[in-house]
């Protein structure tokens, strides 16, 4: 199984412009893999939301929230998963990512 470090060395941030959609499209996600969000938890968090909330940057009722600054999130089932930063304005700056998980497990 693969650990996918969101944003690679940049991490989960708004300090530099980062294309999280491009990062996601350049990775293959499989059941059993995990996401690692690295960030300063004074300034950011990670919320799992649905598609509508993702599109509108709505962080009012997330399915899950993570605040450790080094969050490992297992990808337990296939489908599309949506994550954003719940700090006001950050999602609008592009701090959000859509993860498409393939049904098959990775061959690692």
UniProtKB/Swiss-Prot annotation:
SUPFAM superfamilies linked: Cupredoxins
Q: Sorted alphabetically, which keywords does the UniProt record give?
A: Copper, Disulfide bond, Electron transport, Glycoprotein, Metal-binding, Transport
MF terms from GO for this chain are: electron transfer activity; metal ion binding
Please give the cofactor(s) recorded in the UniProt entry for this protein: Cu cation
Glycosylation positions in this chain = 58
GO cellular component assignments: plasma membrane
Got any disulfides in this one, which pairs?
57-91
Q: Where is the Phytocyanin domain?
A: 2-103
Its recorded name reads Mavicyanin
What lineage does UniProt assign to this protein's organism? Answer: Eukaryota, Viridiplantae, Streptophyta, Embryophyta, Tracheophyta
């Amino acid at each position: 199984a693969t650990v996918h470090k969101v944003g690679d060395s940049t991490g989960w941030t708004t300090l530099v412009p980062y294309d999280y959609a491009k990062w996601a499209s350049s990775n293959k996600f499989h059941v059993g893999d995990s996401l690692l969000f690295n960030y300063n938890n004074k300034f950011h968090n990670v919320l799992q939301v649905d598609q509508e909330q993702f599109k509108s940057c709505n962080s009012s009722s997330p399915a899950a929230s993570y605040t450790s600054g080094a969050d490992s999130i297992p990808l337990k089932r296939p489908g599309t998963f949506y994550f954003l930063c719940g700090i006001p304005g950050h999602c609008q700056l592009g701090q959000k990512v859509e993860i498409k998980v393939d049904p098959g497990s990775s061959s690692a």
